[in-house]
């Protein structure tokens, strides 16, 4: 219990530092919690961390740093009033013999996150990314999982690597040969008309042509179930070459036939919710397709506790201490 409480204290401390306009990273190692301050707080915490440790970041913008340890990095949430940002490009390169899993939650990464090396099972939950790439053609990362994430630029799926997307928004998915992609309940967009790179397995997904073009269908090596196309030409069938495509209608739908407000232009306030007609299009599980169906409906709220209110008195008590009152918001089920 002591270990759990110490970890929670670290999370809460970091989550509230924005009220003091400070950048704080708390590093939890066993029963010990160490704090680092300033724009390089993340860099310094990562340097001091051991595999299996947890780093909690306050709101604000932190300089990026390369990560080569199976640690957990948490932020204040991507849709909180003051999110956590990691700025500049950085590498994820975990030694393949590291027994711990790398995890990231509740953080906005404003530049490019790059995979390097040979490792498995990194997990990204409730994060927002600009671009995701690979270091070179030798990269082999298996079971890269993104859940409840937004990728507003390009996800470049590296050859010899495997990706799992669960209830995510992806602006551009570029898949190299031999990369394996499985997407469930996702909204997937291309800025152009070419969906030839979308070879993988897709369930309950919505494919959107941003510019309304449609000249190349999905490759016949792909599989799609209970997916729809939006904003393609009326005569174009995105799924025409697929041999496995149950419940994937040939006719494209308009934005207004599916979404409440989305019209192809990304913004941080866009929630990608479906209107009543869109909700009537059911997935393989009998629930709505898109971000809010499936086993893990989209929700950007962090899964760990954060401070929701803090009252600091104007003066100390008769013992010379501050009677600070703290309200904690727990994640909803």
Per-segment meaning from a language model:
Residues 25-63:
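Acidic Gly/Asp/Thr-rich repetitive segments characteristic of extracellular carbohydrate-active
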Residues 115, 135-138, 145-270:
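Predominantly extracellular beta-rich ligand-binding scaffolds that present long acidic/polar faces
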Residues 1-23:
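Bacterial Sec-dependent N-terminal signal peptides
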Residues 244-302:
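C-terminal accessory segments
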Residues 70-117, 131-132:
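Right-handed parallel beta-helix/beta-spiral solenoid domain characteristic of secreted/periplasmic
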Residues 60-61, 77-81, 229-235, 280-287:
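Acidic glycine-/aspartate-rich tracts in secreted/extracellular proteins
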Residues 52-54, 59, 64, 70-72, ...:
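Detector for repetitive beta-architecture
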Residues 287-322, 329-331:
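Short, compositionally biased P/S/T/A/G/V-rich stretches that sit at domain boundaries
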């Amino acid at each position: 219990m002591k270990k759990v409480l110490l970890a929670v204290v670290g999370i809460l401390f970091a989550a509230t530092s924005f009220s003091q306009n400070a950048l704080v990273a708390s590093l939890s190692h066993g029963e010990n919690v160490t704090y680092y301050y300033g724009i390089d707080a993340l860099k310094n915490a990562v340097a001091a961390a051991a595999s299996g440790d947890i780093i909690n970041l306050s709101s604000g913008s932190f300089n990026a740093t390369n990560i080569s340890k199976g640690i957990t990095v948490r932020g204040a949430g991507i849709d909180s009033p003051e999110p956590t940002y990691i700025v500049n490009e950085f590498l994820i390169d975990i030694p393949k013999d590291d027994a711990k899993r790398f995890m990231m939650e509740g953080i906005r990464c404003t530049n490019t996150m790059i995979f390097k090396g040979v490792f498995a099972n990194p997990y990204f939950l409730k994060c927002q990314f600009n671009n995701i790439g690979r270091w070179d053609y030798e990269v082999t990362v298996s079971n890269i999982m993104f859940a409840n994430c937004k990728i507003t630029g390009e996800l470049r799926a590296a050859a010899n690597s495997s990706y799992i997307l669960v209830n995510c928004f992806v602006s551009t998915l570029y898949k190299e040969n031999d990369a394996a992609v499985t997407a469930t309940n996702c909204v997937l967009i291309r800025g152009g008309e070419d969906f030839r790179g979308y070879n993988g397995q897709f369930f309950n997904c919505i494919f959107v042509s941003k510019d309304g073009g449609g000249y190349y269908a999905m490759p016949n090596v792909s599989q799609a179930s209970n997916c729809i196309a939006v904003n393609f030409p009326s005569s174009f069938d995105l799924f025409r070459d697929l041999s496995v495509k149950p419940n994937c209608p040939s006719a494209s739908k308009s934005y207004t036939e599916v979404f409440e407000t989305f019209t192809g232009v990304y913004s941080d306030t866009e929630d990608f919710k479906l209107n009543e007609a869109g909700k009537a299009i059911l997935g393989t599980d009998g629930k709505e397709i898109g971000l809010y169906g499936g086993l893990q409906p989209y929700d950007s709220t962090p899964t760990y506790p954060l401070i929701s209110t803090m009252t600091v008195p104007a003066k100390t008590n008769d013992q010379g201490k501050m009677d600070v009152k703290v309200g904690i918001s727990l994640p909803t089920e």
